[in-house]
Amino acid sequence: LYWAGDATVCNNQLQVLWNGVDNTNQQALMRHEGICLATYSLEGNPGDDSYMKLINADHHFNDADIYGYGSTLWEDEDGHIYLYGSYNNYDMLVARTARHDLTSPWEYYVSDEQGNFSWQTTYPTEQEVKRSRIQDTDCSMPWVIKKGDTYYMFAQAKWFGREMYIFRSDKPYGPFVDCKRLFGLPDLLDKLGERTYKNLYMVNLHPHLSRNGELVFSTNTDAKDFGDNFNAVGSADFYRPYFYRVYNWEKVYDE
């Protein structure tokens, strides 16, 4: 079982990171285990047999990974791809590639016991990641962009929170500080049938959908009553994405 991570384009091929999920232990479902790197062809156009054809799937690309590095990523002008993961769901971590190619060597950003960070090629231990978080407030599902000379991180409040936070830093690997509430998500969905929901998750940022510099987010939800996901009026609308545009988002730091 795989959970989709982020992706990039290299040599006209789409590279997608797939996070392995282990459900063999009923007491610890959805446990992260390893990363698969799949490569797809971008030859032709959507609808062509060649377009998005699977070229290769390396199911053992990173068997050591248990922290979801690459769940989201940022391709920086410094030549690296920054790969974000998490420890304990709410401590953000970062690794980076040597080049703009996910198959190039990875390094992990780790703090020593004195709080000094450095890049290392060995996969970090649990003790290392416990002291290596890169943000100042608990959050999940980070997305990083750059505007001007500043890197901004957007992330969801903990426990499936219905608020989105914004952080800033002068580096893509943090520390991300100055946490502020960016916006709140509604308690009701624009759908038929039951409009309240249980969990809000998979808050994704879509820079390619921006028209005039605004932020575009999508969210997923599920029903309070599990059966309502399948057999009630509007059931299909629980899991489908809902989209939100956030204008003048930089103004939050003018307050």
Give the location of each predicted region.
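Beta-rich carbohydrate-recognition and catalytic domains
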Residues: 9-64, 76-140, 145-193, 209-214, ...
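Beta-propeller and closely related beta-sheet repeat lectin domains
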Residues: 1-8, 69-73, 140-143, 201-207
